Amino acid sequence: SARQEVAVLPTPVQLTTQSGMFVLKNGLKIGVSDESLLPAAQYLQTILQNAVISTAEVGGQPADIFLKLTDTKGKEGAYKLNVTSGNIVAEAADYSGIISAISTLRQLLPAAIEQSSQDASHSIPAVSIEDAPRLAWRGMMLDASRHFWNKEEVKHVLDMMALYKLNKFHWHLTDDQGWRIEIKQYPLLTAK
């Protein structure tokens, strides 16, 4: 079978495609090496919720997907991601590296997984990736001072920032007399 083209942004330091696919299935088990990674596992569960029912647990080896804190001897945010037909292992020295690995994994998923109630089979190409941020500051500015952005729109922007591993959010909230966040305790801020 032909290997699926793999596109990840930003381009990883090293990406090697391998033969095979990891097939997502109900009952998928997400294991973590440390309790501090449970929020990351829950974030991954949220990403996968339209495709599979999964569980997350500490020390969950063997696991279909395993998130592991380990000394990668890399800089902050560095990670290794290995996808085979049998399992997925993400390793990083810190939490931000694990989140970056999850963001990469999300990019490897078929786009259809982002839609609700998928009954189709989904798979992830087998790859080996090593990556680290090349810039300490990868950000975006949202200028909300000229028109109102509702909560869901802002959350979507933040979600897209996470997908592309942007790590700084500048929220331009006010210009001169304009104030764009409703604070119930101070209603005059948005009334004038």
Where are these predicted regions, by residue range?
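Aromatic- and acidic-residue-enriched carbohydrate-binding clefts of CAZyme catalytic domains
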Residues: 177-192
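A conserved hydrophobic secondary-structure block that centers on an alpha-helix together
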Residues: 143-176, 183
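Single-residue recognition of alpha-helix capping/boundary positions
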Residues: 36-40, 153, 185
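Acidic, contiguous N-terminal accessory segments
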Residues: 1-138
